[in-house]
Each structure stands twice: as structure tokens, then as C-alpha cells.
Amino acid sequence: MIKEVVKRDGTVVPFEKNKITMAIYKAMLSVKNGTMKDAEQLADKVVARLKDKERPSVEEIQDVVEDVLMTSKIDGKTFTDVAKSYILYREKRRAIREEKELMGVKDDLKLTLNAVKVLEARYLLKDEDGKIIETPRQMFRRVASHIGIVEALYDYIKYKKTGKVPENAEIIGKVSPTQEEVLRRAFGYMKEDGIIEGTFEEFMDFIQTKGTSAGHYINRFEEVMSSLDFVPNSPTLMNAGTKLGQLSACFVLPVGDSIEDIFETLKNTALIHKSGGGTGFSFSRLRPKDDIVGSTKGVASGPVSFMKIFDVTTDVIKQGGKRRGANMGILNYNHPDIMEFILSKDSENKVLSNFNISVGVTDDFFDKLDNDDYVDLVNPRTKKIMKRIKAREIWDAIIDQAWKTADPGLIFLDEINRKNPVKNVGDIESTNPCGEQPLLPYESCNLGSINLSKYVVDGKKIDFDRLRETVWTATRFLDDVIDANKFPVEQIKKVTRMTRKIGLGVMGFADMLIKLEIPYNSWEALEIGEKVMSFINDESHKASQALAEERGVFPAWYGSEWEKEGIKMRNSTTTTIAPTGTISIIAGCSSSIEPIFALAFVRHVLNGQELLEVNPLFEEKTRELGIYSEELMRQVAETGNLENVKINEEVKKIFVTAHEIDPQWHVLMQATFQRYCDSGVSKTINMRSDATREDIARAYRMAKDLHCKGITVYRDKSKTVQVLTAGTAETKKPEEKEVIELVTKMPDKYLKIDSTFDPACPTGKCDK
């Protein structure tokens, strides 16, 4: 009788007959032959054939399954077609395993092939000869061990105050050299902050004699990552457990109006990019082009010329060869060089390839635009008006360039600062490269995202209890990252630890909707987004409040908006919606809150490599419906969508893709998540190649009216090289009638999102 099974990697696991049954049933569904009862009977035959083996291998079991399918007959039915489907699937899995082995990766988490390719190129540790020396699970263990060990410091602080050790404490005999380095550095941070007593040697004696809960949290952190329920940002995955030790994804650096300040910032940028971080800047302090330079009596070259220097530096660094550097460049709308800035990424100029650019706009700009008024272009050095220009002229230039090149986007500065919980520290003038994280000068933030596709149970409901557990674990993890971090610049350490911002976000939202059988472009989808994100935001706040009771409030809490409301928080912000481009590949889910880009598409990653992807949920659905075929997959791959494919209309609605969705639905979804997000939302408003400038203007204005903090559009094929390509053929644009109907149907709750009721404003009493 079978008791255990030997897996391909040699590990032994308990035998589960149901796995055989489901494998057979899935093959039956793909050819529309057989029932669950048939599958159960065939599985019984497989088990009977193996009755003399107590511990067969996976390969042995699969060989018997093939033979049973080829030779069995039930009620006159034969299953040779099912056997063929099973054999083809088995062969496909074998080819994938072989390709993973050729990459030198031992995949102990059964990740997708694309995930393994990304891990092999960027994340898994290698020796001096370039040979991979860890598995994906070991990578997550490395990260968990680096982050979780700082729990020991808080156990020590508590012990010094109360004389108690945690109930789950375990004595640590010896920590690794890397863990000791993390502890020594974090101990120093806490000593500077005045929250820890004694010497480092006394602390080490404590964990080796009294014990710590660090082991418990290390295991929990590893579990939540290895299950792909939660994945932290790329620098944490790449640098945790290494000498580099820099764990944050996003930074904002100030750019002062002097050569000394500019090149000090450039040096800091290089250090950040070397460690895998991205940087955001406002160049609005720089004197305009042709302004006088006091020291030489010459003329200034202006912000755009200095941006080019930052761009070239980024290109040279290439973040240690692991990923391309990224920058956000912002210039306020009333800077004298605003028109040059807006045109700086025109295809004719071909500069700033390592920059996203956005115009910083305020409520005053939109007032002038609505009243057809003039904007005063003010020299930031002298504060004098250099020129007056119609707001409409600036707006038209922004829209025209966004249509041509997808840049610039908009950053709504007043909206950001209305929701700034630490006004006592300063105003926010910039964001990280993708726009989701508004930050103070010298501030950094570490991000991580929950894979929502993992929380749909029974095909119809969301497991909020398990989601709550993950939110609390992830919030604790991200707070620990701040202490485990090795900051590239002293000032960044100071500001980051002062505000302790963290950014918990989501990915796999489109997958969640598909599993729930809800179209992305529907009011029901907006309601799900609202329900899920409000839950995550509330629970992350509760988790941060619990950490504040346990560890203390963030230092800048005193005088903050949180203190005014009497709410003790460990972190000034807790939620951010990041784009999750790479970590969603690792997790095997859809990106961020984006719809599916295509059901079949080519993804350009890793310096020119291409990954061909077919959506696994679509493949699963077609097999379930018994309509899967290679011919159908090839047909879908022509455009990446189902618009011209003869298939069930309900399936078409559920598997709607980004370019089939009217831009207004994209903006509505961004606004819905923004209402329940402390920081910002990175979302691309995808448009078809034949979208008009009016479409872009409508989306930009809608984002402002719905209290988004920024907006980026992308008209298909508006860049010469784009990250995602869907199929090879064009699809027709929805009729204008659909757009008109959409606007007519829009309920007040989404048209009139008042900032005083926005949960992204922590107190609910933000100034208008």
C-alpha cells in the first residue's frame, strides 16, 4: 500500500490520491471526455497497480497513470484522447524542468519558468565564477534571516524594562556574521535614538542566555514569502544577507541651486543606484537657462541640462548590472524652463532615457486653466516674474507630448501635501521613479506587496481572515526592514528613521477578479477594489498602532497629523501601490492593480531578453470549458485578446485586457485604490495607439477631479521600445458611444470623492 511518494528532488512526502484524481480530471476537461466519477475510478486503478510499492517515485506514478488511461474502459468509454492530453502536459512540464536545470537553478518552490529566469538573472546569489549557489527557497530564507533577526533587539529593550522574555523565545547559540553585522548596525541606530541601553556585548549575552523571539519571526517571514503570499521590493531580495545590505526601493533627493549641491546629489544618486534603489528629484530650485551665475558672471544652463548629467550617470551605473537605474524628474509648472522640460523627451531629442518626467501642478494651475488665465513664470533664485504664459499653452504642450511620448505625467502637489501626515517635518516636492511614493527630501521607503490572487477561496469569496494575518506579518516585516537597513547616505538614515514610512501594496488584483469572475471594467470590480484596499489599509494601521504600543511611535509623530488625532503610529504611512513589475513575475501573478495586459504577449526584460507568456488562468479556464487547443492559443496570440475570437461572451468579459478597457475605467480604478492608500498609486492609464489627445486630456483632468496624487498615461506604441507587447495585430477602438454611456453611468461616489472623507488622509480633517 502506498504511504509516501519520492519527489524529483529526492524529498519524501505523504501520498495523496486526490492529486492523481485531479490530474486525470483536468486532462479530461481539456478534451471534454469523462466525469469526476470516472477520474476517481481511474485513480483507484492507478493505486491498485501500485499496491506493492510503499514509496513510489512521482515518475513511476505518472507512468502508471498514462498506461491506465491508454488501456481502461468505463461504461463503454475509452480515454486514449485523455491520455494524449496528459502526456502532452507531462512533456511540457519536463521541458520546463530541463530549461530551469540548464539555467543552473534548483527550483524548490515550483515557480513559473519566467520567475526562474528573473531570479537567475537578478536575485539568486552566485559565486565568483557566476554559478548559482542558492535555491529560491534559500533566497527567501536569506531575506527572512536578515530582517527577522532585528526582533532580538526589541526583545532586549523589553527585557531591560520589564525583566520578561517573550513566550516563544529560543536561545540563539550563534548568529551568522551577516546577522551580527545587522545587529551591530541596528544597535548603533537605536543607541543614537536613545531607545536602547547597555553595550552590544551585553545584548549578545542576552540572546545567548535568555533567548529571543527572532527565530519565530524568521520562520514566519520565510513562510509568507516562500508561499508567494507577500514579496518585498527588489533591493530587499537582492541585498539582504549580503555585504551591500541596502534594502529600500525608493528615495527622494533634494537638488540645490549650486554646483556643489548638484554634484553632491549626483554622488548620492550613484550610491543609491549602485545598491538597486531608484531616485526622485524636483529640479524646481535650479535657476533657469541663461540666468546669471554669480561666481563667474556667466550664464546658467538650466535644469534640463543638469538632468542630462544625471541621466548619463544612471546609464553608466546600471545598478551593479542587476537592473537598470530609474529616476523621476519633476519641474513645477511655473518654472521659466517649463516648456523645455515638457519637450525634453520628444522623440526628436532622444534624451533622458533613464527618467520618467512629470510636471508638478497645483490647484492654482487648474484655476488658471479653467479661467483661461496666465501663469507667472518665476525665477526661483530671484523670485521675480520672468515671463507670463497662458495656462492653456502649458496644458496643451503637456497633453501633446504625453500623446507622442507618454511623458510628462502630472504630480498633484497640493493633493499630496494635503494628505502629508508629517507636515511638521516639511513639504513634499517629489516622488520615487514610478510616482507611487511621495517622499520628503532625503527620505526613503521600503515596499512590499501582497499577492491577492492567493486569497480567493472556493472560487467565489475572499479569505479576509488569512489576508489580515498576512497584512500584520508584512507590516511588521517592513518595519523591521528600517532597522535592518544599511543606508547609503547618513542624511537618508536620519530622515527615514524619523518618519518610518513603509509601503505595503498589492499585486494579483486582476487575477483575483478573474477568479471571482468579475470583469475589470465594471462597478463590481471597483467595489471589490474598495473593499480589499480599505481592509488592507485599516489592518495595516492597526498593525502599526500595535507596533507603536510595543516599540514606540515614529520620532516625528510629535507634531504630526497623527498626534493631533491622538492616534499612536509606528509608521507615518503604511500603504503604497507599487507597479510590482518584477516581483509579480516571481509571484506568478498579474502586476499591481493593473488589468491583464494581454492573454499572450512578449515581455522585454533583462537587457533585451524576451519572455513569451500565456495567461495561466485563461489556459485553465479554456481547459475547464473543454475548448483548449494549440490553434486557439495561436489565434489569441495574434492580438493578445479575445475581441475577434469566437468564444463565450462571459469569458470575453472576464478576460478583458488593458487596451480593451476605456481609459476612464483605468482612472476610476486608480482613484478607488487611492482613497484607501496612505501614499500614492502607481498605475498606467493604458490607451490604444489610436487614442486622441482629447482622450489623454480627459484622463488627466479626471485624475485631478478624483483626488489622485499623480497620473501617467501610455498610448500603445508611443515609445520606440516598450516593455510589454501584446500580439502582432491591431484591434479596433471601442465606439465613442461606449465612452458617453460610461460617463453617464458614473455614480456620485466616484465623481465626488471629497478629500475630507478620503481615508488616505489619516485624520479625516485634511485642509481642502
Curated annotation (Swiss-Prot):
Keywords: ATP-binding, Cobalamin, Cobalt, Deoxyribonucleotide synthesis, Disulfide bond, DNA synthesis, Nucleotide-binding, Oxidoreductase. Substrate binds at residues 234, 249-250, 278, 432-436, 579-583. GO terms for molecular function: ATP binding; cobalamin binding; ribonucleoside-diphosphate reductase activity, thioredoxin disulfide as acceptor. Disulfide bonds join 250-445. InterPro entries: ATP-cone_dom, RdRp_reductase_class-2, RNR_lg_C, RNR_lsu_N, RNR_NrdJ/NrdZ, RNR_R1-su_N. Residues 3-97 form the ATP-cone domain. The active site is at 432 (proton acceptor), 434 (cysteine radical intermediate), 436 (proton acceptor). It catalyses: a 2'-deoxyribonucleoside 5'-diphosphate + [thioredoxin]-disulfide + H2O = a ribonucleoside 5'-diphosphate + [thioredoxin]-dithiol. The keyword Oxidoreductase applies. Its cofactor is adenosylcob(III)alamin. GO terms for biological process: deoxyribonucleotide biosynthetic process; DNA biosynthetic process. 5'-deoxyadenosylcobalamine (coenzyme B12). Its EC number is 1.17.4.1. The keyword Oxidoreductase applies. Belongs to the ribonucleoside diphosphate reductase class-2 family. Provides the precursors necessary for DNA synthesis. Catalyzes the biosynthesis of deoxyribonucleotides from the corresponding ribonucleotides. Monomer. This is Vitamin B12-dependent ribonucleoside-diphosphate reductase. The lineage of its organism: Archaea, Methanobacteriati, Thermoplasmatota, Thermoplasmata, Thermoplasmatales.
